[in-house]
Amino acid sequence: MEIRRATVADALQIHALISHFANQELMLPRPLLSIYENIRDFQVAVIDGRLVGCSGLHFTWGDMAEVRSLAVDPEAGRRGIGRALVEANIAEAREHELVQIYAFTYVTDFFAKLGFRVVAHESMPRKVWMDCVNCHKLNCCDEVAMVLDLIEGVEPEPFDVSQVRVPIVNSLKR
């Protein structure tokens, strides 16, 4: 198995993989345009020349990033592909000296084995204000928030909503 940075040529396969699980409501959908726009966020797993998994590490602030769009081809499951992808995300986050990474997930046992811990959604204000405000599940989110502290004893920078340009917030200021 090879874990490598995604290229633009991988976008359609990444989209198909994510859509497979999104159609079953096991993860949020990602428009193809979003995948192209964020292709540098993605790592892919390849076995015998076939893309069998993907995971994105999306930077959400100077000290945090989200593991998102983790998907493994069901035919290639149970081979450690998801683990290898998230470990690549963790390594990249450490290279960038991030304090914390997080995921919103349905597979808490998987992330717990990698050292993530469950936290309240309310403890993730950047995620809520930057992404969740645009999600159809905003008021009924059933995903579990989990974090992995990368630097022991160091907390992420406190959140100040005035630093984020969110249409609803900006309209309230008028």
Question: Language model features by range: what are they?
Answer:
Residues 16-29:
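Helix-loop element at the rim of GNAT/NAT acetyltransferase active sites that forms part
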